[in-house]
Swiss-Prot record:
Main location: secreted
Record has Calcium as a keyword: no
Spans annotated as Disordered: 98-124
InterPro entries named in the record: PE-PGRS_N
Subunit structure: Forms a complex with PE10. The complex interacts with human TLR4.
Pfam families: PE
Residue ranges of domain PE in the record: 1-87
Organism per entry: Mycobacterium tuberculosis (strain ATCC 25618 / H37Rv)
A Gene Ontology term for the protein's cellular component: plasma membrane
Protein name: PE family protein PE9
Stated role: Together with PE10, induces macrophage apoptosis through human Toll-like receptor 4 (TLR4) signaling pathway. Interaction with TLR4 leads to increased levels of phospho-IRF-3, increase in the transcript levels of IFN-beta and pro-apoptotic genes, up-regulation of IL-10, down-regulation of IL-1b and enhanced levels of macrophage apoptosis.
Keywords: Cell wall, Secreted, Virulence
Family: Belongs to the mycobacterial PE family.
Superkingdom classification of source: Bacteria
Length: 144
């Protein structure tokens, strides 16, 4: 079975990258509109006029398709960033980056419990980060 772990930071970075790619493609398409849809017949005969119409029709289809792709790309970026926001709101305080975790001293917190033989022992804790993946903090236990 495959698992996918995504953190809000990774989703935000992916959305930013995808948005940048979409912007670059949109600029290139806008620059190409005039050159691709305004093909003129090279001569006065019917064959060259038909070829020019064919190129213009293909260019118009391409630009219509690229507009649909741009709309999908915009929706995809919104979905990524919106999903990240929902994830952050639902996780609340538990959703912190690893750096914030370390800065807060979460790795140094220890809980003790009384074992069956009356000795106090350190207990291993699970801390869940933004990705939903347990981060195990291992503490040494001396067993007799």
């Amino acid at each position: 079975m495959s698992y996918m772990i995504a953190t809000p930071a990774a989703l935000t970075a992916a959305a930013t990258d995808i948005d940048g790619i979409g912007s670059a493609v949109s600029v290139a398409n806008a620059a190409a509109v005039a050159a691709t849809t305004g093909v003129l017949a090279a001569g006065g005969d019917e064959v060259l006029a038909a070829i020019a119409r064919l190129f213009n029709a293909n260019a118009e289809e391409y630009h219509a398709l690229s507009a649909q792709v741009a709309a999908f790309q915009t929706l995809f970026v919104r979905t990524l960033t919106g999903g990240c926001g929902v994830f952050r709101r639902r996780r609340g305080r538990q959703c912190v980056t690893a750096a914030e975790h370390r800065a807060a001293g979460a790795g140094r917190r220890q809980r003790r419990r009384r074992s069956g033989d009356g000795q106090w022992r350190l207990r291993q804790q699970r801390h869940f980060g933004c990705g939903g993946q347990p981060e195990f903090r291992q503490h040494s236990e001396h067993r007799r």
